Amino acid sequence: MTRHGIVLGFTLSAGLAGAQAPDYDREMRDLASRPEIQKAFEIIVELEPQTEKDLIELTEIPAPPFKEEKRGIRYAEMLREAGMPDVEIDAVGNVITRFRGTTGGETVAMVAHLDTVFPEGTDVTVRREGNRMLAPGIGDDTRGLALMLTVVRAIVRSGVKTRGDVLFVGSVGEEGLGDLRGVKHLLREGGPKIDQFIAVDGGSTDRVLNKAIGSYRYKITFKGPGGHSWGAFGLGNPAHALSRFIYHFDEEAGEFVITGPRTSYNIGRIGGGTSVNAIPFENWAEVDMRSEDPEQLGRIDAIMKKAVDRALQEQNERKRRGDPLTVQVELLGNRPSGTVDPSTPLIQRALAATRHFGVEPQLETGSTDANVPIALGIPATTIGRGGEGEGAHALHEWWSNVDGHLGIQKALLLAVATAGIAE
């Protein structure tokens, strides 16, 4: 998960609502005052020790990129234990269960991701320092998984009935090179019907995402014959070509991102070569480019590819002998972008649900599982998992249960409001 710039949601939503718009704040007050919802809220508070136990157990099951299976199997078991008899693990590893509505109305998906960014072998043992629990991945997004389990328990035990179905999903492949593969599969043509989408990701209870940051990720590999640094001197050098590419890309992209919709670029990793005294046979770099705007992303993508071509041409012109260098441009990831109009009922309900708990909401931009439905035109948002925490994607990541129950109550209220309460 990635979180970016903040806009005050209260001011924006109030301005857009207008005199004729539905009163979503009143809708939330009325819904929250119903006996079954009040009971669900009480159950959430009573389940705080169980929620913490779930969080620790799941955190200590490693879920590196592309290796979420063990955690997914256990999460499916936990959903069954929470009261959902029909749980499936789909072809790519998503864990899915359906809370059935009474009328077959719109289907709402609530999604938290199973995977973490940490490689295999990372110590994920949870330890305590005061009120903090520390472990890689404990917040992002294991807390989201624990939150959903408690939402399920509270709905089942309280007797809440919804008009539409609520699909609870533990997704795979949200992080890094996973490229949102779990949600892309979930929303494939012929997949389960999903009309609205709520991702649970990110730390703060005030979070309401309505803009999805798109990204391209590439591996750029320059290749040549390679040889001895003395005896084969004069051959085209892939390392030199890679250096030229990085220089030219940074020069033009650095100017490009100064204006227009927010856009970023990064050379995150470079590698290649075999020895200090050997001309490499290949050198590579991994490139990440992001933007709030699809057209802007396309433009910086073109700048990157132009820099590749220029570097290849220049280095081949400099070689004194041997075959020309070649280059391979491999697309590693393509995260779609888009925007949900703040006046959309789902966004308005998310803002109102946040205000209901005395928190001023923030409209945000980010890169989450919600990117996919937003790009497909499905109303979608990402809300925070509650509590307090820092250090996402770092070994020192921590989470603390400071009013963490409010994040769970908000998630339940939003899910039920979106699916519709059955009378």
Language model features by range: what are they?
Residues D115-R128, L209-T221, A352:
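Acidic-glycine-rich active-site phosphate/pyrophosphate-binding loop
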Residues Q20-K39, L55, A239-E423:
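Metal-dependent amide/peptide-bond hydrolase catalytic core
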Residues G5-G15:
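Bacterial N-terminal signal peptides
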Residues P22-L134:
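Acidic/His- and Gly-rich active-site-bordering loop/insert found
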Residues R132, G137-I213, V257-I258, S264, ...:
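Acidic/histidine-rich catalytic neighborhood of metal-dependent amide-processing enzymes
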Residues P62, M110, L114, R128-L177, ...:
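Alpha-helical metal-binding/catalytic segments enriched in His/Glu/Asp
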Residues H113-V117, G203-T205, A212-S215, I270-G273, ...:
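Short glycine-enriched loops at secondary-structure junctions
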